């Protein structure tokens, strides 16, 4: 059975697509951003508007974060956490 150009080209393109898909996947165990992020900042947003202002402050830093006022013992500080 002869392999014609009509069959060979789609076959090669399919193989290249499959190989590139495998290399681009990030399902490898132990890699990626799976941990929780928590970064606390000044208490200013919490003083200005509580959790709502802290939320706006964190979303402005990154759309992947949410804000929460957390008491650190003496005052509320604005902490940005992962969603």
Curated annotation (Swiss-Prot):
Q: Would you tell me the protein name for this molecule? A: Putative defensin-like protein 111
What's a BP term from Gene Ontology annotated to this protein?
defense response to fungus
Main localization of the protein? Answer: secreted
Biological source species: Arabidopsis thaliana (Mouse-ear cress)
Q: Which family does it belong to?
A: Belongs to the DEFL family.
Signal sequence region: 1-24
* Location of this chain's protein in the cell: Secreted
- How is this protein annotated for GO cellular component? extracellular region
- Source taxon at top rank: Eukaryota
UniProt entry keywords in alphabetical sequence: Antimicrobial, Disulfide bond, Fungicide, Plant defense, Secreted, Signal
Q: Which gene encodes it?
A: LCR50
- Disulfide pairings: 40-80, 46-69, 54-78, 58-79
């Amino acid at each position: 059975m002869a392999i014609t150009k009509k069959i060979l080209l789609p076959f090669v393109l399919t193989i290249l697509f499959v190989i590139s898909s495998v290399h681009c996947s990030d399902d490898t165990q132990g890699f990626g951003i799976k941990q929780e992020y928590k970064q606390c900042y000044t208490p200013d947003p919490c003083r200005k508007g509580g959790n709502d202002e802290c939320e706006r402050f964190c979303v402005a830093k990154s759309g992947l974060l949410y804000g929460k006022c957390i008491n650190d013992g003496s005052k509320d500080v604005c902490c940005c956490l992962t969603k």
